[in-house]
């Protein structure tokens, strides 16, 4: 397949998948902001993760459209920042799950301030260093870090730390689930379900990091380069959509939306019935008045006739 045609197909595919992911992340944020009763503390962390996904994908798309423009460098900085924030929020979500299952910490919300410091603060420090040494450039098709060393220390190394940390966390959590919850089937099923969701999110984001890193160090015009570019585009673009399916397509969310639409529908029909009733009442009144007027006119005519 000609490279030009492949680039065109990949561009359209990426745009579609990016749109799905952004819409999925936005709907997840919207749903849990709309219904506070569904917004548990772990869900709050998922909302922050979705925010980082929305911004990272948005500026990722902008970076490909900002080549040879004044917005190229700012787009490169923002892409780098929000992708790093994306990685660090997966760590925060995983560590919070570790606190609940392994440590059985009832005050896990105490750590939220530290999650924010880690997930927003460390990426900020990294991009400050990269920007200070002018490592963001236009790479001829998109805007990102200048060379392999910048990618290695500014993107790969933080990713390695996060991926290794998350692997250790999920190993401990899996062992704890197997060891302590085997005698409580109901609770086990729910916890295993949560574990699968969290682990799937980690795999999705971790795989995009791996594919993106390999693509950065491969020949972009080779078959291997194209393969990893496609894998990176797909895995990156479906993160938000996967989270939406995992957290919003369930009975509780459907029940809340159904209740809201039912209440809105009942309220709408009540207003319509009241309006229809007022119209019906005004009809007979108008007829009576008209009849009275006609009677009065007839009487007056008869008097003058007499």
From Swiss-Prot:
Top-level lineage group: Eukaryota
Sequence similarity: Belongs to the G-protein coupled receptor 2 family. LN-TM7 subfamily.
Annotated keywords: G-protein coupled receptor, Membrane, Receptor, Transducer, Transmembrane, Transmembrane helix
Residues on Extracellular side: 1-15, 63-70, 135-152, 218-222
PROSITE patterns: G_PROTEIN_RECEP_F2_4 (PS50261)
Name by which UniProt lists this protein: Latrophilin receptor-like protein A
All ranges on the Cytoplasmic side of the membrane: 37-41, 92-113, 174-196, 244-306
Subcellular location: Membrane
GO molecular function: G protein-coupled receptor activity
Gene name of this polypeptide: lrlA
Any single biological process term in GO: cell surface receptor signaling pathway
Record membrane topology: Multi-pass membrane protein
Gene3D superfamilies membership: Rhodopsin 7-helix transmembrane proteins
Main localization (coarse): membrane
KW ATP-binding (keyword) present: no
Keyword field contains Transmembrane: yes
